[in-house]
């Protein structure tokens, strides 16, 4: 039985695609590499043996801090190399982020293949720096190839978990015959977007809509608005069922969320996270805007009136929502997980 080490940590955008690939490799012995006290620990649970290393990014101006981070990176590379050798790992798969540096370099030192999945339209720093050490870089967006001209790449889109491909029942008290708006701040939440949305919600409720608002865990005012038609949750595991039922989403533009919107044919109003590295969420969102699947507003330009009026207009014109839904589905790649799984198999 082949042995795979998955290095995926931090946010849902890194962890969920990795879980989607893992589901297609049930004949592999899989081990998971993460970081302490992050999202992956609860999501992976006891499905796979779980290992952790401590890694940090270099976002500091302090030379002493940078040196400390560099020494920590070197230490973590050798930790992962030791893990690879002890567990007789055959191939490493990573979805990027800080943890990918240690995983890719350890795989290189161990002489085994490393497959990197870059989900964003604009490649991250880790991808740009370390793609040369990878067997292949799998791309979430076809246009990303232009930023990695000398790297072996293949476009596969971004994997989602298997439940997105089958109808999922929704365990929330929402009637079948009412419009449903879903607010998605990403796995880390989005307090500023939450504040804006709460100013708009009363108008949408008056129209008869229900709103499910995923606030994240760090919003101090998450429960400040109370109404039977307004459901707030810090996190919801059945995103497949929720988006399958939704008429419209208001969302950040992380690559994983966008893929889930496409698979479920959900029209969207996108608000890119303004502090994302190299503004990659804006580039992600533009693909959906160009396709006619979404509207996009920068956070600094979006007001409660603009958002209220746009959502109200869309709810009043189901034909517009239907057209956006059709355009969204055209962006979906239904076999992304299978393509990545095959890439991993073929690398050994």
UniProtKB/Swiss-Prot annotation:
Pfam families, A to Z: Glyco_tran_28_C, Glyco_transf_28
Membrane topology according to the record: Peripheral membrane protein
Enzyme class: transferase
This protein's encoding gene: murG
Protein's organism: Crocosphaera subtropica (strain ATCC 51142 / BH68)
Function noted in UniProt: Cell wall formation. Catalyzes the transfer of a GlcNAc subunit on undecaprenyl-pyrophosphoryl-MurNAc-pentapeptide (lipid intermediate I) to form undecaprenyl-pyrophosphoryl-MurNAc-(pentapeptide)GlcNAc (lipid intermediate II).
Family, per entry: Belongs to the glycosyltransferase 28 family. MurG subfamily.
Catalysed reaction, written as an equation: di-trans,octa-cis-undecaprenyl diphospho-N-acetyl-alpha-D-muramoyl-L-alanyl-D-glutamyl-meso-2,6-diaminopimeloyl-D-alanyl-D-alanine + UDP-N-acetyl-alpha-D-glucosamine = di-trans,octa-cis-undecaprenyl diphospho-[N-acetyl-alpha-D-glucosaminyl-(1->4)]-N-acetyl-alpha-D-muramoyl-L-alanyl-D-glutamyl-meso-2,6-diaminopimeloyl-D-alanyl-D-alanine + UDP + H(+)
Subcellular locations according to the entry: Cell inner membrane
Listed name of the protein: UDP-N-acetylglucosamine--N-acetylmuramyl-(pentapeptide) pyrophosphoryl-undecaprenol N-acetylglucosamine transferase
């Amino acid at each position: 039985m082949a042995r795979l080490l998955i290095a995926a940590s931090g946010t849902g955008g890194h962890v969920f695609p990795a879980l989607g690939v893992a589901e297609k490799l049930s004949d592999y012995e899989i081990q998971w590499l993460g970081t302490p006290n992050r999202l992956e620990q609860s999501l992976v649970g006891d499905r796979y043996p779980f290992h952790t290393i401590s890694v940090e990014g270099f976002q500091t101006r302090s030379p002493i801090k940078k040196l400390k981070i560099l020494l920590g990176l070197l230490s973590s590379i050798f930790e992962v190399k030791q893990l690879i050798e002890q567990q007789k790992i055959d191939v490493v798969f990573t979805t990027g982020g800080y943890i990918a540096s240690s995983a890719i370099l350890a795989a290189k030192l161990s002489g085994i293949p490393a497959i990197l999945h870059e989900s964003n339209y604009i490649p991250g720093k880790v991808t740009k720096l370390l793609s040369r050490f990878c067997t292949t870089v799998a791309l979430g967006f076809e246009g990303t190839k232009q930023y990695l001209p000398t790297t072996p790449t293949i476009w596969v889109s971004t994997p989602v978990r298997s439940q997105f491909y089958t109808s999922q029942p929704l365990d929330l008290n929402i009637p079948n015959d009412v419009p449903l708006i879903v607010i998605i701040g990403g796995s880390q939440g989005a307090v500023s977007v939450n504040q804006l949305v709460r100013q708009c919600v009363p108008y949408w409720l008056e129209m008869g809509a229900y709103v499910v608002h995923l606030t994240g865990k760090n919003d101090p005012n998450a429960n400040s608005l109370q109404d039977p038609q307004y459901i707030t949750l810090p996190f919801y595991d059945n995103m497949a069922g929720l988006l399958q039922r939704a008429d419209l989403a208001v969302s950040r533009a992380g690559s994983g969320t966008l893929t889930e919107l496409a698979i479920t044919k959900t029209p969207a109003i996108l608000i890119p996270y303004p502090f994302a590295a190299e503004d990659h969420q804006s580039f992600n969102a533009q693909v959906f805007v160009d396709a006619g699947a979404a509207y996009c507003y920068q956070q600094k330009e979006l007001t409660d009136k603009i958002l209220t009026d746009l959502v109200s207009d869309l709810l009043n014109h189901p034909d517009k929502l239907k057209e956006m839904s059709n355009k969204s589905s055209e962006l979906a790649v239904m076999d992304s997980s299978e393509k990545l799984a095959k890439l991993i198999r073929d690398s050994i």
